Amino acid sequence: RGQTRGLGYDAYRFLAETLGPAAESTFVSAADLVQEYLDTRLPDEMPHYTAAVAVTEAIVTRALSNDVITPGTTTVGDVRRALYDMLGAAGVRTWFQPDLRVQRAAGEVATSRGFLAVAPESTVLMPGDVVHIDFGISYMGFDTDWQKMAYIMKPGERDAPAGLKAAMRNANALQDALMLRQGRPGRTGGTVFTGTMAEMKTQGIEAMIY
């Protein structure tokens, strides 16, 4: 599907300014063609796409469950191998390497390019850890992309700590600002980003969108 990746607004302006008005006047938008190509679906395809979503959800849910994770014993590498085993059992493949990231209370959080870094394969998952999985499958030309988080409860706990629940509410507030209020037709990506970040600032929430 590489042929469907078009120009962003900034790239368009760069080409127009670099090549000049004469060349810009010959530019023809392929947006309608690309959109029609991507939007065209046969009725018989839809059950398969629904199945792809269900398979992705089932694999990730099991990978984050006690079926796979034994706190104090299971490593990041073990979970990754379990993901690949479940892919094989389901007869599907992934379109990128599944990543796991781990946040640990009172522990130094490694970052990469400003984001939480992928955890080493040897990292042992412990009670109190927050585990993040980035995972997706490819099936009949359709790619899923799941990002899920789980909290490994400590002995005696029956629910996630209040602080983690507050963090989830903040994340939901960011989602609402981005998808319900700022992300409207006719706006550039930069405008949506700036508006969303400004809204988060007024709510006292430190946020980032990528």
Regions inferred by a protein language model and the residue ranges of each:
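Active-site neighborhoods and metal-handling regions in enzymes and metal-associated proteins
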Residues: 1-210
